[in-house]
Amino acid sequence: MAMKKLLIASLLFSSATVYGAEGFVVKDIHFEGLQRVAVGAALLSMPVRTGDTVNDEDISNTIRALFATGNFEDVRVLRDGNTLLVQVKERPTIASITFSGNKSVKDDMLKQNLEASGVRVGESLDRTTLSDIEKGLEDFYYSVGKYSASVKAVVTPLPRNRVDLKLVFQEGVSAKIQQINIVGNHAFSTEELISHFQLRDEVPWWNVVGDRKYQKQKLAGDLETLRSYYLDRGYARFNIDSTQVSLTPDKKGIYITVNITEGDQYKLSGVQVSGNLAGHSAEIEKLTKIEPGELYNGTKVTKMEDDIKKLLGRYGYAYPRVQSQPEINDADKTVKLRVNVDAGNRFYVRKIRFEGNDTSKDSVLRREMRQMEGAWLGSDLVDQGKERLNRLGFFETVDTDTQRVPGSPDQVDVVYKVKERNTGSFNFGIGYGTESGVSFQAGVQQDNWLGTGYSVGINGTKNDYQTYSELSVTNPYFTVDGVSLGGRIFYNDFQADDADLSDYTNKSYGTDVTLGFPINEYNTLRAGLGYVHNKLSNMQPQIAMDRYLESMGQSADTSSFAADDFTFNYGWTYNKLDRGYFPTDGSRVNLTGKVTIPGSDNEYYKVSLDTATYVPIDNDHKWVVLGRTRWGYGDGLGGKEMPFYENFYAGGSSTVRGFQSNTIGPKAVYGYGAHTDPNDNNDDYEACTQSSGCKSDDAVGGNAMAVASLEFITPTPFISEKYANSVRTSFFWDMGTVWDTNWDPSSAPSDVPDYSDPGNIRMSAGIALQWMSPLGPLVFSYAQPFKKYDGDKAEQFQFNIGKTW
């Protein structure tokens, strides 16, 4: 089009002059048609100046130069005596850009693509570029199977040579795959091969991955999957000969045919490594060992290459090249693998930098590093630093970037890019419950206090049965070696009878201090001392309580009792989770225990063990299986029993969902005469008149507990990728029990269950939603108990909520 205009302009110029071949001297230059473009700008873009002698070639160059500015739709150059007359038609200016009918592509993405092509508000409109954009968008829709889609650019003229640009989309429907055929397969059935595809011609209801909607990109991925399937089973000569994609006449159905040549199976005859091994030939040789007669496997070859790169990366060779060349012997059906290695230069770390830590101090991040500045670059050390930052729980994401230092052949900077999350929470609540009455709760918890890494918490609860307050502080780096120091003080006034537990009141206060000693990257030992004062009152006779009082030398009808205990607290934590919150891979084991020491009124020990294992079942870690267990056991020492107020409890959102908190397990069996006061309005149970006691629904807990949970974590529907790291959905199956190993069935009426039996397992199943919301960690769960016992109390819907800054 431009050349046609150039030719017309040249002809006009030739016809306007009588001596074009000899040229003429330009005395003046005039423009016609300029509106937005200044005369000076137009003159600067021209190769001709006043006083120049010009000919036909100069005029052609002038026209080309003016078109090249992108400001003009049409250019003509005429001669009027010695004056050069330039007639132009400016391209219109885009006043606005709107979209209509686009559902698959967001407006923001369209604007970005248009701007990349130079189409934006305030710029001139190039109709040729617009045609290319229309075609490109239609090609995109074709690639995702929408072959009836169309995109039209509607240009509406406005005053002052401006236009409104509107892109009108008719997306149509996605073509569905009617049939997938594989031609040339003999070793494996078509059904077996297609079962590994994302694209399917039939998708059962339970298959959440398969898709009948055609997408060019998915087909390319499926073809690569097909290639890998054969190469991993020894078919070294496998080849995809051709692929045909055919449309039905109505463009709503697609037939896919893949033509392949399987070839024969080949076995590896050996691996030969050569090149610059940087002195690590022995270690590399271990990575290339093969079993005699092993089938050729493409995935194993790729893994071997990656393992060699990782090995060299640990020794500072940041950019090694590893290339494998298979030598195929068709005569004996073997493959000899020749591996060429070039370790390259060894790199050293000049600086370690952190980006994105607006709250956390650099020192908090730097102390987690295992890579040192000035040392050679160790890829494993850099990765360890990333893992440790993730496990802090301060960040949503942690990424690393190794940047070469300009002008240096062997230096790099390591950059950790973090995205901080809200680590502090303030929660305040006012509620009313049938058991608790009016309830007030407030708390402040900051796991990264002022960016120092300190964990500080202040919590309090006030309701009809409890007044509780606690202050806790932990310094994770009390020493430079990573020894942590934590402590807390607390006060608790607890009236168990109003909480649907056995009848007693306990006013307690205490303090403890704990040191944590890191053993290695994943293991920490803890040791500390604690003190607690318990003052019990309003105790009503029940069998478990009677046993404890008698072991302490008190009579069964004692209604008040006080005890001061000093404890040695200990623990062990193994943590190999991939991050501190919403993990998707790895395991965590936490063992805690305490035992009373001389000077204590009570003599007992108590141990609990928590485990959690996350197993991703896809490469993106969006589908994860979680297994959790919790075990607890305690008992008395020196002929004494463990205090009943130290018992284990189960039920609620942290143990067995679907049951009310702390209601699973043994129930109180009250002795004769309990609550016979006619003025006592406690109606948890009828007045007991049996000499041997009577049962109730008041939970007393037990000295042994076992809880297990199996959870299937799935992508949350309708949540964009931006918020995927803040929301988690899961389906779960919980089970658990609490029992009393010291229970004597002969001490209770015949209608009371045997509370020493660990087989009374409760079970429930349901769905949970967790959200790191602006209000703090928020957890919803709905569970249905499907195995329960008399006295158990169901609570299907449960949630926790707080507020975060």
Curated annotation (Swiss-Prot):
Gene Ontology biological process terms, A to Z: Gram-negative-bacterium-type cell outer membrane assembly; protein insertion into membrane
Q: Which InterPro entries match?
A: Bac_surfAg_D15, BamA/TamA_POTRA, D15-like, OM_assembly_BamA, POTRA
Answer yes or no on keyword Membrane.
Answer: yes
Q: Which cysteines are joined by disulfide bonds?
A: none
Q: Which PROSITE patterns match?
A: POTRA
Q: Which UniProt keywords apply?
A: Cell outer membrane, Membrane, Repeat, Signal, Transmembrane, Transmembrane beta strand
Q: Which residues form the POTRA domain?
A: 24-91, 92-172, 175-263, 266-344, 347-421
- Gene3D superfamilies in alphabetical order: membrane protein fhac, membrane protein fhac: a member of the omp85/tpsb transporter family
Write out the GO cellular component annotations: Bam protein complex
Q: Where is the signal peptide?
A: 1-20
Q: Where in the cell is it found?
A: Cell outer membrane
The lineage's top-level taxon is Bacteria
- One matching Pfam family is Omp85
Q: Which PANTHER family match?
A: OUTER MEMBRANE PROTEIN ASSEMBLY FACTOR BAMA, SORTING AND ASSEMBLY MACHINERY SAMM50 PROTEIN FAMILY MEMBER
Which protein family is it in?
A: Belongs to the BamA family.
Function summary: Part of the outer membrane protein assembly complex, which is involved in assembly and insertion of beta-barrel proteins into the outer membrane. Constitutes, with BamD, the core component of the assembly machinery.
**Assembly:** Part of the Bam complex, which is composed of the outer membrane protein BamA, and four lipoproteins BamB, BamC, BamD and BamE.
- Could you tell me what this protein is called? Outer membrane protein assembly factor BamA
Q: Which species is the source of this protein?
A: Salmonella paratyphi C (strain RKS4594)
Please spell out the taxonomic lineage of the organism that makes this protein: Bacteria, Pseudomonadati, Pseudomonadota, Gammaproteobacteria, Enterobacterales
